[in-house]
């Protein structure tokens, strides 16, 4: 068959992503930017070349579980391909984790790190996933770890030397527990020598080749529920080539992230050490979750940016109706909408990274610390929804080619679906956002930030956008105030709409700040940022207003469960 169409090509991912570049330029001081930007451009070239080729190879050669050796001994060895292992080495070389702990640029180190992560992730075949947990474990050991762990383990988790670099797992999900971690069944028994032995099942572990892990378990005799859980550190045995008290039951056959080994594990007397106080496992491991959720947001924004880059390039190559797609007004509208969503996701992510950096360096105000607590679930849940809708639109931009596996585009969509699931689903995070808003301090801090952003007046075109943000914020704050006085069911029922509305309203305000900042240099050069802010703010009118009525009233329940209460019968379990 004759050749008929050029496929999309990927250029330097730093040079080609204006929204990312300008966001980072606004947040970093000029002297820091001058130091790090050349290296970001170099990484952007590496991501589009060497790393992309490795990622394609890793996707084609997924991990395998070898249960037995040639002599029948059970070894439970997970084999990954050379390309996957090389991507891990590149992460160490590029300091994707290390930068946050070297803190060469103080409070700005997290922004620098997240810029690197946004470039690294889309060409990593999800090697970024173990990095998220490694970063979270490093911070947890930095805060809560005993001196021996800080001296022996922490340097490996933040090393730039591929030979010394270790990754860490975060094993929380169990068959019964899931998001309800208080239902976890793993038990910790004293080993008689000051340590512990863990026994239980971990149903979903995504860093199964990690050298170390943090996990939750219930000490013998501890009370039921989350308050009975403690956090433990363990060495898997991977560093020595053989698992210690761990059986790999199977690798998961997943919708996406297929290069990433994900497994069900059985813990059978695994040696472990408690980290933090007994019964404080959930608050202690929250340090990991706060970081992995922001990684999730950054990787979601990066994935959306990758899809947008491919769609933009294809629009210049593909001709339809006698013209390139890039000259068709309706296609340009579609791409512009995607670009606005991508810019919004970046703004949310990097504002959270900025807050995290300030908190870690001890310079955050009390209000900023409260804001970070609310930002973490808001940013994760908002970007998780954005990337699924956005990448679905990207696939559609390619027509039938987007539905063909060997273009690689269906894999982009499959992978995107993980972002609203990993590290807490939308509903779980919406409830967490409600908890963060309890007491009013965090919500008041966010309200002040958004209100401050809409006070700008330098760009006349943004006046309608500022009004839209003010109106949406007022509605959301008013709903929260009223619902907080109502029954708990009403507050929970509206949590999703409230959190998504708040996240998108915040994103719109950040886009306004970005556009105003760019316009100070040149209104003409700021045109893309102004248009992104204008377009995104226009979507706020479509945000559902949270319902104040309790679903227990009946109608919501009947609709949700498929009939009147007396008609709904659960199927018998067999």
Language model features with spans:
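C-terminal amphipathic alpha-helical interaction region
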Residues: 452-574
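Internal maturation/activation junctions in enzymes
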Residues: 145-194, 350-369, 376, 387, ...
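C-terminal helix-coil-helix/basic helical segment that borders enzyme active sites and/or dimer interfaces
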Residues: 343-380, 396, 480-493, 512-527
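C-terminal catalytic subdomain
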Residues: 416, 420-458, 499-516
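A glycine-rich, basic-preceded beta-loop-alpha segment at the flavin cofactor/substrate interface
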Residues: 240-245, 249, 254, 261-292, ...
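Extended, charge-enriched "interface" segments that sit outside catalytic cores
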Residues: 1-106, 568-574
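Internal helix-loop-helix
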Residues: 73-164, 206-210, 342, 346, ...
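A short core secondary-structure module
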Residues: 195, 199-245
């Amino acid at each position: 068959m004759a050749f008929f169409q050029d496929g999309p090509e990927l250029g330097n991912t730093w040079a080609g992503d204006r929204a990312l570049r300008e966001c980072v330029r606004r947040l970093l001081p000029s002297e820091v930017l001058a130091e790090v930007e050349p290296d970001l451009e170099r990484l952007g070239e590496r991501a589009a070349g060497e790393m992309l080729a490795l990622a394609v190879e890793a996707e084609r050669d997924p991990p395998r579980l070898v249960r037995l050796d040639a002599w029948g001994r059970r070894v439970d060895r997970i084999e990954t391909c050379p390309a996957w292992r090389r991507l891990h080495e590149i992460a160490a070389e590029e300091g994707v984790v290390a930068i946050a702990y070297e803190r060469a640029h103080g409070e700005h180190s997290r922004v620098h790190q997240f810029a690197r992560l946004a470039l690294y992730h889309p060409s990593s075949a999800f090697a970024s996933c173990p990095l998220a947990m490694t970063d979270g474990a490093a911070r947890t050991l930095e805060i809560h770890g005993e001196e021996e762990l800080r001296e022996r383990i922490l340097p490996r988790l933040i090393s730039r030397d591929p030979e010394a670099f270790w990754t860490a797992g975060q094993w929380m999900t169990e068959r019964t527990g899931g998001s309800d971690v208080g239902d976890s069944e793993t038990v910790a028994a004293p080993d008689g020598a000051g340590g512990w032995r863990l026994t239980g099942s971990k149903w979903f572990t995504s860093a199964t080749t990690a050298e170390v892990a943090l996990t939750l378990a219930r000490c013998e005799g501890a009370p039921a529920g989350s308050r009975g859980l403690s956090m433990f550190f363990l060495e898997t045995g991977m560093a020595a080539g053989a698992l210690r008290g761990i059986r790999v039951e199977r690798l998961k056959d997943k919708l996406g992230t297929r290069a990433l080994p994900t497994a069900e594990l059985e813990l059978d007397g695994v040696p472990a050490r408690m980290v933090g106080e007994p019964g404080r496992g959930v608050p202690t491991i929250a340090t990991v979750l706060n970081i992995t959720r922001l990684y999730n947001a950054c990787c979601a924004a990066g994935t959306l940016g990758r899809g947008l880059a491919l769609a933009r390039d294809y629009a210049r190559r593909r001709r339809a109706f006698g013209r390139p797609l890039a000259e068709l007004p309706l296609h340009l509208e579609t791409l512009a909408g995607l670009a606005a969503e991508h810019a919004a996701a970046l703004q949310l992510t990097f504002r959270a990274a900025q807050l995290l950096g300030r908190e870690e360096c001890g310079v955050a105000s009390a209000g900023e610390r409260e804001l970070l607590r609310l930002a973490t679930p808001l940013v994760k849940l908002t970007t998780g929804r954005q990337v699924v809708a956005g990448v679905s639109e990207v696939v559609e931009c390619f027509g039938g080619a987007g539905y063909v596996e060997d273009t690689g585009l269906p894999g982009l969509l499959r992978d995107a679906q993980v972002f609203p699931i990993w590290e807490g689903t939308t509903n779980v995070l919406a409830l967490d956002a409600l908890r963060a808003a309890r007491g009013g301090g965090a919500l008041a801090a966010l309200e002040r930030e958004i209100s401050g952003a809409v006070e700008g007046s330098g760009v006349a075109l943004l006046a309608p956008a500022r009004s839209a943000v003010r109106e949406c914020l007022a509605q959301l704050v008013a709903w929260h105030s009223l619902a907080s006085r109502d029954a708990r069911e009403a507050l929970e029922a509206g949590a999703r709409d409230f959190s998504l509305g708040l996240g998108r309203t915040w994103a719109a305000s950040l886009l306004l700040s970005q556009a105003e900042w760019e316009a100070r240099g040149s209104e003409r050069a700021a045109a893309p940022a102004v248009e992104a802010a204008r377009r995104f703010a226009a979507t706020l009118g479509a945000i559902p207003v949270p319902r104040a009525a309790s679903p227990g009233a009946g109608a919501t329940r009947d609709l949700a469960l498929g009939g009147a209460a007396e008609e709904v019968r659960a199927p018998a379990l067999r």
